[in-house]
C-alpha cells in the first residue's frame, strides 16, 4: 500500500515538473548567463587584439596565443594541479610531462596544447612551433548540471555533474627563468607595503 502511494506521488511530481519545464516557468538547461562562460568567451577574443606598428629600433613583440577548452567532464580542482605543473615550461617540455601522466586531465591538456601550438603557426606568424612557452595555465568552474540521485524509501537528492574549463596562453620565445621563492619575512614585508599603499575611495 505504501509503495503504491509513493509511486503515485512520485509520478505526480514528475508530471508537474514536465509541465513547468514545457511552459517555460523553469529555466531551460541551454540558457546560462553566469560570468564563468563570459570569461571563457572573452579569453579567445584576445587573439583578435591588433597592436600598433612598432618602430624599427624597438625589439620585436613576441606572439601570444590564447586558447581554451570548455565544458570538460572533469573536476576543476584536479585539473588545477596539472595546470600548475606545466606553468612556465616550454611547450615541448609540457607536452612531454603530460604524455607520461596517467591522469584523465593530462590527456585533455595535451590535446589543448597541441591545438594552441598549431594555431600559433597558422594564425600568429610563429616560425618555429617549439619556440613557445606556457605563460598562463589555469582551470575554472564550468556549468554544472543538476541531476537526481535516488535513495531508498522513495527519497531522492540532488547531485551535480561537474564540468570545468581549461585556459592556456602560449608566448613566443624561451621560458623566463624561475624566480627565487620569497622568505617569510619578505612576504610579510610585501604584505605590509600593500596595506600601506591602499587608497581610500572618496577620501582626501
Curated annotation (Swiss-Prot):
Gene3D superfamilies: Ribosomal protein L22/L17. GO terms for molecular function: structural constituent of ribosome. It is found in: Mitochondrion. Keywords: Mitochondrion, Ribonucleoprotein, Ribosomal protein, Transit peptide. GO terms for cellular component: mitochondrial large ribosomal subunit; mitochondrion. It comes from the Eukaryota. Coiled coil: none annotated. Disulfide bonds: none annotated. SUPFAM superfamilies: Ribosomal protein L22. CDD domains: Ribosomal_L22. InterPro entries: Ribosomal_uL22, Ribosomal_uL22_bac/org-type, Ribosomal_uL22_sf. Residues 1-27 form a transit peptide. Belongs to the universal ribosomal protein uL22 family. Component of the mitochondrial ribosome large subunit (39S) which comprises a 16S rRNA and about 50 distinct proteins. This is Large ribosomal subunit protein uL22m.
